[in-house]
């Protein structure tokens, strides 16, 4: 059995992930549900060989030393995959996340005009947040693609690993992969400020240093896109501020209130008739919102988003209601994801 055959099968089924796990048959995740492929269980040696074949020496060394490693892998004509190889109680395991080879446009994803407005801001910080596998990378790729088609800018991305590959259209695009082209997010961000970028994408704002540098880049006139694993705008503000020591919190609130342009928190929901659709909470950095951030009144943010509909803001529940009204998702699925389920 060949890994490229398994990955081609997985992509053909529209799977978001392929799971290999010693002692079990291969499995795929389709529309959010994990399903078994009708094949015999794989032994440890088989899984080990399948993943070793596609690793380079550095990745093999990492895997042996740290018992896990991340890398990306491309099957030409099929798709690119983000791979995590690990060890588990029955032996080796690996997960291949499908990255479609084509960047979907905002129109194809059904993203509203507000996403263009958010992308068009000249400088500041735009955060796209949500749990793992909620489509953050897809949303960001569409926003970068829109800019790549409409502006004459330098786009610099720092990713671990590179997911969507952007060709330079109107923009110059440089994509840097952590551990391959740079030692880490903070190192790459530090030198980014000397690389004349207009737009910087930070794949993950994991630690204090990366968040600090991203805020500085946004303050110094760059448009910075970043991702966090938070599930709402309010939690995102708290998360960023909480990373800093007590004596810096007031300063960070002030920096955020100046530079934050938007927080888009998203989740994926099963569509009626198959497939999934993204639902978004959208917060825009209006003077009222900036004030709430500065004065640490994050609890009042939800009602500010509710009343900011004319400015393009929406709560997750407002978005879910719209998707139910369009007949895209069922009431039951909306209720599962809603902040206030009784509204459904």
Kindly give the residue locations of the regions a language model identified.
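Short, flexible helix-loop junctions that flank or precede catalytic/ligand sites
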Residues: 1-344
């Amino acid at each position: 059995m060949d890994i490229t055959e398994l990955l081609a099968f997985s992509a053909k089924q529209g799977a978001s992930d392929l799971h290999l796990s010693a002692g079990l048959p291969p499995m795929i995740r389709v529309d959010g549900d994990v399903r078994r492929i009708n094949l015999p269980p794989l032994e440890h040696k088989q899984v080990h060989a399948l993943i070793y074949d596609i690793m380079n020496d550095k990745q093999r060394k990492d895997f042996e030393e740290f018992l896990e490693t991340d890398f990306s892998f491309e099957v030409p004509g099929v798709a690119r995959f983000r791979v995590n190889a690990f060890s588990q109680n029955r032996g080796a395991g690996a997960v291949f996340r499908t990255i479609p080879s084509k960047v979907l446009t905002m129109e194809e994803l059904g993203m509203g005009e507000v996403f263009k407005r958010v992308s068009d801001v000249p400088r500041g910080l735009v955060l796209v947040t949500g749990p793992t596998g909620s489509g953050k990378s897809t949303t960001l790729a569409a926003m970068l693609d829109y800019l790549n088609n409409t502006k004459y800018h330098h786009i610099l991305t720092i990713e671990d690993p590179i997911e969507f590959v952007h060709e330079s259209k109107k923009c110059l695009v440089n994509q840097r992969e952590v551990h391959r082209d740079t030692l880490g997010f903070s190192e790459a961000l530090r030198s980014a400020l000397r690389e004349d970028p207009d737009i910087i994408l930070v794949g993950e704002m994991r630690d204090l240093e990366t968040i600090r540098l991203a805020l500085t880049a946004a303050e110094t006139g760059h448009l910075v896109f970043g991702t966090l694993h938070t599930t709402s705008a309010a939690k995102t503000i708290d998360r960023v501020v909480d990373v800093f020591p007590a004596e810096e919190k007031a300063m960070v609130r002030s920096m955020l209130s100046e530079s934050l342009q938007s927080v888009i928190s998203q989740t994926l929901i099963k569509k009626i008739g198959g497939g999934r659709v993204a639902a978004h909470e959208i917060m825009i950095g209006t003077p009222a919102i900036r004030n709430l951030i500065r004065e640490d009144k994050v609890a009042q943010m939800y009602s500010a988003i509710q009343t900011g509909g004319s400015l393009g803001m929406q709560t997750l529940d407002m978005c879910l209601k719209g998707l139910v009204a369009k007949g895209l998702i069922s009431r039951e699925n909306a209720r599962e994801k809603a902040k206030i389920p009784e509204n459904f």
